[in-house]
Amino acid sequence: VVGNVYFHAIAVGSQSHYALRASNYNKLGSAASAGCIRMTVADAKWLYDYAAVGSSVKIEKGNSKKPGPLGKAATIKIAESINYDPTDPSVPAATKKKDYKAGRISGYMTSKGKKVGY
């Protein structure tokens, strides 16, 4: 990714773990900008931790019927009342678990309220 195109979590407009608009989060996986790669907090953190600056990244095009070589993670959707990324490790697991049990977060989550695989 070059120029003004970046890998990043969803922009929230302030430095808070609780300033996310659910409608923006629920757009993950669809085109919503000028080419940036938007991802969950957990995925952005993984990339930051494991890919050095200047690393080459190969973008694989896929879809739900042919998801690419690494598969396709389950999509997590959040209700309009949720103002945080469910994969954000800074949000207490108890909060995620409560919202998941109440049906405000859908998708594959562990019993502790974390996204499967993290």
PLM regions and their residue ranges:
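Exported/periplasmic cell-wall-interacting domains
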Residues: 1-118
